[in-house]
Amino acid sequence: MDVLVGCSTGINKIYNIHKKTPTGLYGALNTTSELNVMTFGWNSVENNEDYVFYGYSNGILKYWNQKEKQLIGEIDYGQSIKAIHPLNNDKLLVALENGLVDVKTLTAPITTQLAPMNLPTLNKKKSPAAAAAASTVGKNNKSKQVIVEPVNTQSFSLNVATNLSGFAMNPSNDKFAFGGKDVNLTIWDLEKQVKTYSAKFKHDFLNLQEPVSINVVKYMNDDKILIGSDFRIKAYDLRSKTNRSSFLDVSFSKHPIQSIQYTNQKEHYFYASDSIGKVFCYDVRTSRQVGSFKDSAGSVKDIAIHPTLPLLATVGLDRHLRVYNLDNRKMLHKIFLKQRLSCVLFSKEEPTNEIAQEEEEIWKNLEENKNRINNDDNDDNNEGNDKKKSISIKVTDNMDSDDDIEDGDDNDVEFPMEADSDDSDFDLGNSDDDNISVKKENKGDSDDSDDDSDEDEKPKRKTPAKSNLRNNNNNNNKGKNNKGKNNSSTKKTSQVLKKKFAGLKKRK
């Protein structure tokens, strides 16, 4: 799902919030003007979201094909543009700051440069800006002459007020409302071209007229409308013919209101922002604040709500695009877009099944990789615990020899032991698996010995060996963590065994 963002310097960006990647960049850098308004093209055109209107403070209106990144046409109105509304029957309405409302009917496809038409208006007095726009396109007579196309275009203008700030069309596109500095809320019928409603501000507690300064106008439906002044938000019921006062009057902020949005998804709530970064949600029924959207810094210039999904997007001077959930008011996305941002639009498309499947596959792969890494770590730990050495010392004695026991293949000392694979420590513990065996191998004849002597000699040979081995086992267990001590204790054990068996041989 794409979000269109308009920068105040003339650069326009498209960002896909599900793929989290920018998908488009077009426009030209222009620091002499700021972007005031941005809207999609005519609904009657196929793929109308591919076409976008941009209105700037220097009076330039541009019509872009954002899919092909191509500028279709532009108009110089000479005054700051406050509103752009593509109407039914190929009409285009543009409201200017000086109170001029220009309506054009385009009977041919817009494939060339647009230009203001030099046609008679319904006003008795033609505004200087309209006269200037009818003669040339641009300022200081440096741009080319206007191309007049009376055959393909019909136009009329309404000079409704001066110092116009807020402007809105009703959902039926047959009436428009506006307000501004010292201009109270007024509604005109576009077809009849007459004023149908004028609001009235209540006097304050001193019975003085409240200053009128309307910045934003927003229709809730054909019968109810919201306005945002410098410090307050008011709501009016247009069905009442006698009571022109507001039925809702809330003190929103101590700073000017920048934007107001309403959605049919939550018909009893509206959303508003001010010039210091506050974004609030209000309940129309109770006139109370429901909650706020956090993390904004600086002026929040524009708010957009998705037509079908519970998503709210904000842009402002802190150069971040933020997307919130309308239900719990939690921030879902925060994207830094480098330029100062003025306007934002949600595309109507919703996330496709392909995108959802891609996200599921990504999460599934991440889980599989995590499980694989954990299994590998467990296998490594088990292998490290299973790796052990078996060290043995074998003791043999040649009873026929009168010499001392010598080291060799026939005179070995064997002790079954276990040690870790990482070191060569000897474990002479007295566990069931650590059996100590002392073997004696007799070589040669012994005719002088008898049965009694043999029976007496056997226990005498085994007893001292076992006792000494157990003592040595205890000593070795105490010094197991020291490799040098274990090696020295093993040498001492072999020397003691040699001496003991040498004594046994002499006694025999």
Curated annotation (Swiss-Prot):
WD repeats: 32-74, 159-198, 252-292, 295-334
Disordered, as annotated region: 368-508
Cell division listed as a keyword: no
UniProt xrefs under PROSITE patterns: WD_REPEATS_REGION
A Gene Ontology term for the protein's cellular component: nucleolus
Key words of the record: Repeat, WD repeat
Positions with biased composition (Basic residues): 497-508
Entries under SUPFAM superfamilies matching the protein: WD40 repeat-like
SMART domains given in the database record: WD40
BP GO annotations: ribosomal large subunit biogenesis
Compositional bias segments (type: Low complexity): 471-493
Skewed-composition ranges (Basic and acidic residues): 436-446
Amino acid composition bias (Acidic residues), ranges on this chain: 399-435, 447-456
Keyword Repeat attached: yes
Protein name: WD repeat-containing protein DDB_G0290555
